[in-house]
């Protein structure tokens, strides 16, 4: 949603907006939703931890859990408990892959063993500027690439399409009619 908002700001006719104040390169993240911090803090409190205790988080593919990493170990929270922490606006957002970014990045570990893919991200290059950055990072040996499988790409497209369908359904329900869109 941030990449989409930035694209709208770049193209909007706003008095005094020359467009030169915008970044030259936009890197967007894959995102299905984000959490309300207040609700997330309450969820953590139910498990006896705070945000400061967290050293990492992950949502492993196919496990339907949120992994919370702390110095004391791993805590697995069922996604059903996390769902009520999702920000309302996310239920209406149709862009799960930062379609308006120069580069879209995310840990979509479809089509392969989840454990094998930890630490890897998928990248979608969406512009010449994005391609130049990736090529530079590879040349400087700060980025290692490997080809995503055809199955992984199909699954990513399926998940993105499903997010769009759910969001559109929620928008229609909220507006009480598709004619109001």
Where are these regions (language model features)?
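Iron-sulfur-associated redox domains of electron-transfer enzymes in respiratory
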Residues: 2-181
């Amino acid at each position: 949603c941030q990449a989409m908002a930035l694209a709208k700001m770049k193209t909007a006719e706003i008095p005094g907006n020359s467009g030169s104040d915008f970044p030259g390169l936009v890197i967007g993240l894959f995102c299905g939703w984000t959490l309300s911090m207040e609700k997330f803090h309450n969820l953590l409190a139910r498990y006896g931890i705070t945000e400061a205790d967290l050293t990492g988080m992950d949502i492993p593919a196919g496990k339907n859990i949120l992994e919370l990493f702390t110095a004391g170990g791993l805590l697995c929270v069922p996604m059903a408990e996390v769902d009520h922490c999702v920000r309302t606006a996310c239920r209406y957002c149709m862009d799960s892959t930062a379609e308006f970014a120069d580069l879209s990045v995310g840990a979509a570990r479809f089509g392969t063993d989840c454990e094998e893919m930890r630490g890897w991200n998928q990248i979608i290059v969406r512009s010449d500027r994005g391609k130049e950055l990736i090529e530079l990072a590879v040349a400087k040996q700060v980025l290692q690439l490997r080809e995503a499988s055809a199955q992984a790409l199909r699954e990513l497209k399926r998940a993105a399409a499903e997010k769009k369908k759910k969001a559109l359904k929620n928008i229609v329900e909220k507006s009480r009619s598709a004619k109001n869109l």
